């Protein structure tokens, strides 16, 4: 296959150039029997050759580590469905279109964090202007005592479930105004919440770890007969993410109480949630307790494998792999990709290459995800020529590259400041029928932001809008931070206004970026207003330069500002934040008194 015009690399396929296949096959130090053992046995009713991980390889890997007996193999989130859509639980997939395409880990993790906890997406028939009117009232009046509810009453709204869901979506990072609106709607004559609106509120409470209120809402749903599997999944995942293992398992008891069946999909969801929270050992203990009560399937073992890899225990991962085989299950491409990615992330590149070779020679054949995993790692290590060899081999194998693969290459070349190559890649994506997606644009914006080119980041944002791709909150956070870093405070605030105009609810990071920018601009009084807004909304206290913040108010003769913030935080139930502000109030008073004595 001829090299693409954007490569700008001398890569002629000749005797002087080693092809990818030769590169893999000629790994002379590789003995596949050391890596795997092949046995002939009947799997699934037919004679096939199975692959087992030998103890020898893992023993060598473990003893080469300074972290004995653990290896560092954190696996990234997959963006694919684990269960049916009704459960909304993410998991693994062999489909290439569902590759976790966050070639930039920060972009990926923040996008993951921004993902909904599990509320079903249903097309809405609500008038956008009506949603905007309601949100404006809430945004302007929620901090006041009862004015918000009074104004909402005067609006004579035609309440619908779609309207409630859309408004809650707009305030998904601001639990207090969201919950006040939810409670107000519940009291309106002629309106009653359904399962969907309850689950929307459950998701917000779960995300902000308001577990006591979340369980109360769940039990209220139970008394009204509105519980769904999605409700339990939201609660289960929330407790697991907070490492509240016992409470996560306790959801099973609530399911029994309300006569819900606990099947393999439900158990898989809990095991997966525990594994993602790096509670692999706890997931294994739970599995061992329950395995006699249900029939584990391939996904069960895959989520356990992932869980052990995330806590860097390859010995247990290998045991799960071999247990899978002993149960008559043949590890599929998903399980292979989990192990492949784990080896790369633990910096065992040579072993990952060997496993990739085994997959090509003995199966299952690598899919687009497999190639993306390899290409992503080479790009992160700036081994762009090798990354392109894998890209060419993928195409030669009959696989079609998707936006995820291109995003990896774009990130790699962009990090090396080869922007001409980046733009050629973007052009090829369009020509090949794989236009940039949201993560591609976010990766580009981050590249521009890191290189202190906020104007270029804005141009990419405009292109994103032109192509009808909705920006995420992370998109705005990156551009806003980029402008503030460049000391272009006016544009930084303009990005904030654009985000609000787009109807995107600012999260903790958004407020932190804005407040830091305002403090840097010397506008601590305005920053204080947004800090108070965060506290009123029930958000976390931001990490900011409190020294600069205090100095500004000290110079302005306003040492009492931290006392006011401490009282506000205490009133909002943010006791840790109240203590922080109280300490700063004490220091500021002391400094002010010292200055007064000197004068």
Curated annotation (Swiss-Prot):
GO cellular component: mitochondrion
UniProt keyword terms in alphabetical order: Mitochondrion, Repeat, Transit peptide
Highest rank taxon of the organism: Eukaryota
InterPro entries: Pentatricopeptide_rpt (IPR002885), TPR-like_helical_dom_sf (IPR011990)
Disulfide bonds listed in the record: none
Transit peptide (first-last residue): 1-99
Gene3D superfamilies membership: Tetratricopeptide repeat domain
Pfam families: PPR (PF01535), PPR_2 (PF13041), PPR_3 (PF13812)
PPR repeats by residue range: 194-228, 230-262, 263-293, 297-331, 332-366, 367-401, 402-436, 437-471, 472-506, 507-541
Location(s), subcellular: Mitochondrion
Matches recorded under NCBIfam families: PPR
Family: Belongs to the PPR family. P subfamily.
Protein name listed in UniProt: Pentatricopeptide repeat-containing protein At3g62470, mitochondrial
